[in-house]
A protein has these predicted regions:
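Generic enzyme active-site microenvironment
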Residues: 90, 124, 156-159
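Inter-motif core of Ras-like GTPase G domains
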Residues: 103-129, 140-148, 187
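Canonical P-loop GTPase G-domain recognition
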Residues: 149-154, 160-188
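Conserved ATPase-coupling elements of RecA-like P-loop NTPase cores
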Residues: 100-103, 131-136, 164-170
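Conserved nucleotide-binding/hydrolysis micro-motifs of P-loop NTPases
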Residues: 94-97, 127-131, 159-164, 188
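Conserved catalytic network of the ASCE P-loop NTPase/AAA+ motor domain
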Residues: 80-84, 89, 113-117, 128-131, ...
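P-loop/Walker A phosphate-binding loop and immediately adjacent motor/lid segment at beta-alpha junctions
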Residues: 134-156, 160
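Conserved G1/Walker A P-loop phosphate-binding module
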Residues: 1-121
Length: 188
């Protein structure tokens, strides 16, 4: 029994060291990106909202995108060219879930860090989900908890092709009274 405890303790210590190493690597990469003065956009949203699919479409990447909870377990960053002269770093993040203690789950630590440090948040919403408004509120609560609620946000209403009747939306940009883009409707 004592030998088992010692082995378990050693494995836990080794895993903690690996986690610290990964955390340091991410911090180093983040500093390098920030030193390049390139704006960072983070895709945030409820789990299974289509963040990875949008990330793949925009960056021509091939990150895992499945119709299942937690298909994305780690953050991924790629350069996104907005024009020939302008590019940003786009980060795909782990989806949020209602009532999950985000601060207690180490898999979320990188996502929470990337989100809080982003210059712009692209809040991806699955408009086909019956509780999408509640999911938006859940994401907003997490953003407030981690101090990212003041980061400028653009709502990306996704999966509009699944809507019908009065809920149907056309793809395009939604603007406020001053003409500023506040949301976009897409299907990926």
């Amino acid at each position: 029994l004592e030998t088992d405890r010692r082995l378990i303790s050693q494995k836990i210590s080794a895993l903690k060291k690996q986690l610290q190493s990964v955390h340091k690597q991410r911090a180093t990469r983040r500093k390098a990106r920030m030193a390049g003065n390139m704006p960072t956009f983070a895709l945030v949203g409820y789990t299974n909202a289509g963040k990875s699919s949008l990330f793949n479409r925009l960056t021509k990447a091939d990150v895992l995108a499945k119709d299942q909870l937690f298909a994305t377990l780690d953050t991924t960053a790629r350069r996104l060219y907005l024009s020939a002269e302008v590019s940003v770093i786009l980060t795909d993040t782990v989806g949020f879930v209602r009532d999950l203690p985000h601060k207690l789950v180490s898999a979320f630590s990188a996502t929470l860090e990337e989100t809080a440090l982003a210059d712009v948040l692209l809040h991806v919403v699955d408009t086909g989900h019956p509780a999408f408004e509640r999911q938006m509120d859940d994401v907003d609560k997490v953003l407030e908890e981690i101090g990212a609620h003041e980061v400028p946000q653009l709502i990306v209403y996704n999966k509009i092709d699944l809507l019908s009747g009065e809920a149907a939306r056309a793809a395009g940009v939604l603007r406020d009274a001053a003409g500023r883009a506040v949301a976009v409707n897409v299907s990926v």
